[in-house]
Structures are given as structure tokens and as C-alpha cells.
């Protein structure tokens, strides 16, 4: 009987142990289900947060792109404005150049009598005044005798043979037939020149 009680006690212990194991397994299943639910909820929340963050990143990217485009437009506008201001007197200067040429031609004629001399003095003052106004606005004369011929600045009208090789060099300007003018780095009118050749 003692043995029966022992075996029954062992069975009870075993069944109690089995029940405890089952409870533990069920509890761990419940915990894992709860953990899975929490994980899926947190995954959904994080994916929701990620999906919510993606539009924010998109908007931020669009904002920075728009800001960069605005800065580029502002720089382009400033460059165009500076260019316009730099060359704003170009058309006026081009229209004044023929009058300046005519005044220069008038000065090349010698005045014989005192009345002609006074007229020539007035023409000379007008010429100097116009010439100074052009210089003050960045317009300079180009093309002098002895300068190296540059097709970007000069227009060769004729060739002049070299008489004195020590003083006259091939490819240099022999005579300026009409002065050229330049506004900053832009040629308003090329100089009409004769060039020394062999």
C-alpha cells in the first residue's frame, strides 16, 4: 500500500509537473502572442511613422530644391542686370561715333583766317568734350600705328609694303584709317587699318 501511495504520489507529481509545463507553455504562447501583437502593432506604428516621415522628407527635399532654384534665379538675374548696366550706353555710343569722326575730320582741315580759327577752336572743344564723355563711360579708342594687328579689334582694309625692316614689322598696323572703339571687353566698332606686309 505504501508502494501504491508512492506511485500515486509520483503520478500526481508527474501530472502536476505536466500541468505546470502545459501552463508554462500556454503562458509563453500567450506571451508570445501578446509579443507578436505588440511587435506587429509597433511594426505597423513604425511603418506608419516611416510612411508619415517619407512625405515629410519629400516635402523637405522639395523645399531645399525650390530654395536652391530661387538662389540660382537670383544669381542669374544679378548677372544679367550687371551685364545690362555694364553695356547700357552701347547703342548711344555707336550712334555718336560717326559725329565724332566728322568732328575729327573737321579738325584736320587747316584754318586760314581768324574767323575759321575760332570755328575750329569751337569744334575742337566739342570733340574733346564728346571724347571725354565716352572715356568717362568706359569707352576707349583702339588701334594705333605700330600696334600688333588683332582681327578681333581691327579690320584690315589695305596692305602696306615694308620699307624699313628695322622700324616696320610685318603684321603691325601701318596707318589707322578710322579709329575703333571698345566698351569694356566688347568692340563697338573695329579700327579700320592698313597692315605692314612683305
From Swiss-Prot:
Positions with biased composition (Low complexity): 40-56
NCBIfam families: PRK14140.1, PRK14162.1
Keywords: Chaperone, Cytoplasm, Stress response
Record's GO cellular component terms: cytoplasm
Name assigned to this protein: Protein GrpE
GO molecular function, one term: adenyl-nucleotide exchange factor activity
Organism: Oenococcus oeni (strain ATCC BAA-331 / PSU-1)
Region (Disordered): 1-56
Basic and acidic residues bias locations: 22-39
Record GO biological process: protein folding
Function according to Swiss-Prot or TrEMBL: Participates actively in the response to hyperosmotic and heat shock by preventing the aggregation of stress-denatured proteins, in association with DnaK and GrpE. It is the nucleotide exchange factor for DnaK and may function as a thermosensor. Unfolded proteins bind initially to DnaJ; upon interaction with the DnaJ-bound protein, DnaK hydrolyzes its bound ATP, resulting in the formation of a stable complex. GrpE releases ADP from DnaK; ATP binding to DnaK triggers the release of the substrate protein, thus completing the reaction cycle.
Entry-linked Pfam families: GrpE
Assembly notes: Homodimer.
Domain of life of the native organism: Bacteria
Family assignment from sequence similarity: Belongs to the GrpE family.
Subcellular location: Cytoplasm
Lineage: Bacteria, Bacillati, Bacillota, Bacilli, Lactobacillales
Amino acid at each position: 500500500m505504501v508502494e501504491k501511495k508512492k506511485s500515486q504520489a509520483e503520478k500526481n507529481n508527474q501530472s502536476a509537473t505536466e500541468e505546470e509545463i502545459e501552463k508554462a507553455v500556454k503562458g509563453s504562447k500567450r506571451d508570445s502572442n501578446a509579443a507578436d501583437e505588440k511587435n506587429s502593432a509597433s511594426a505597423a506604428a513604425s511603418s506608419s511613422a516611416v510612411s508619415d516621415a517619407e512625405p515629410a522628407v519629400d516635402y523637405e527635399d522639395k523645399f531645399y530644391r525650390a530654395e536652391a532654384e530661387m538662389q540660382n534665379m537670383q544669381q542669374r538675374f544679378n548677372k544679367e542686370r550687371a551685364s545690362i548696366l555694364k553695356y547700357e550706353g552701347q547703342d548711344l555710343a555707336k550712334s555718336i561715333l560717326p559725329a565724332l569722326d566728322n568732328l575729327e575730320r573737321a579738325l584736320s582741315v587747316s584754318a586760314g583766317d581768324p574767323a575759321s580759327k575760332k570755328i575750329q577752336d569751337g569744334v575742337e572743344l566739342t570733340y574733346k568734350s564728346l571724347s571725354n564723355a565716352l572715356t568717362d563711360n568706359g569707352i576707349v579708342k583702339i588701334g594705333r600705328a605700330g600696334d600688333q594687328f588683332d582681327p578681333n579689334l581691327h579690320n584690315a582694309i589695305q596692305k602696306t609694303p615694308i620699307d624699313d625692316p628695322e622700324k616696320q614689322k610685318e603684321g603691325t598696323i601701318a596707318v589707322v584709317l578710322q579709329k575703333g572703339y571698345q566698351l569694356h571687353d566688347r568692340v563697338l566698332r573695329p579700327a579700320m587699318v592698313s597692315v605692314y606686309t612683305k
